[in-house]
């Protein structure tokens, strides 16, 4: 069989095209891998900070043997859970039991798609960014309910029911607060919301324009994270460990990861929606604006904006960790009353007030 020169060139061009597609695929996945690496490091830092802050509040030393200042303690705990035996309940629903933790983790990780960590540093700048986050985060309680139901354990099932009830109770006030912010910014895009706060610097933050909404969003975020005083789905004194009771090994580690990922996502959204995101508090002044724009200056500006965003997020993290180790747990009826009888009317009134001001200003 004789192949002429034209056919050989066609075959070579086709192979080159396939190679370019593979290279493009690798380049496209690099930002996702970078984000996953950053998320992993952030979770390890949050775990270390919580242990140090809780030790300081309780006048203890905290972790000190695993690495300098106990920095490697979280890695040691994760490695231990990785090699633990994965025990399955004999009378449980094994497929649902295995899928539950994965659904919770994936739903939280997808929320990072629309979070602008810095200037021009967001995976997906969508026109419905904040609503996509609310929709995705609503899937996580389904995984927790599946975990509780499939364990065939009364404590686990009650914990799953509590998680679902708590999520529904506080998702609605949180959504109303996000709607009020969207009205002020005339957009549902997270990037547009941050840029709308940059005009007047520190005084342009939505924290000052929406103080009531900020407080409601703060409380609702803590409840969504199931942190003390809102950790009723896994109350040790009542439910052993709630929906996590029958889990061990890596699956238990996934639930541990979900709680800190949820806390990180909530902190970043507090920063994006109310604290100006990556913007500094000085209006109209950018240090890098004095230099001619090039690649190096662009990288420095992006790095600086990521640093500013994370610094603001750590403020909320510090508040939530301090609250966890200082306030007692609420009862279930108190938690539901707070969500339905107080936060829901307040958030609805705040939304109506914001809508009225926007209509008057037209």
UniProtKB/Swiss-Prot annotation:
The keyword Translocase applies. The chain crosses the membrane at residues 27-47, 94-114, 128-148, 164-184, 202-222, 247-267, 303-323, 335-355. It catalyses: a plastoquinone + NADH + (n+1) H(+)(in) = a plastoquinol + NAD(+) + n H(+)(out); a plastoquinone + NADPH + (n+1) H(+)(in) = a plastoquinol + NADP(+) + n H(+)(out). One of its GO terms (molecular function) is NADH dehydrogenase activity. Pfam families: NADHdh (PF00146). Belongs to the complex I subunit 1 family. NDH is composed of at least 16 different subunits, 5 of which are encoded in the nucleus. NDH shuttles electrons from NAD(P)H:plastoquinone, via FMN and iron-sulfur (Fe-S) centers, to quinones in the photosynthetic chain and possibly in a chloroplast respiratory chain. The immediate electron acceptor for the enzyme in this species is believed to be plastoquinone. Couples the redox reaction to proton translocation, and thus conserves the redox energy in a proton gradient. This is NAD(P)H-quinone oxidoreductase subunit 1, chloroplastic. It comes from Oryza sativa subsp. indica.
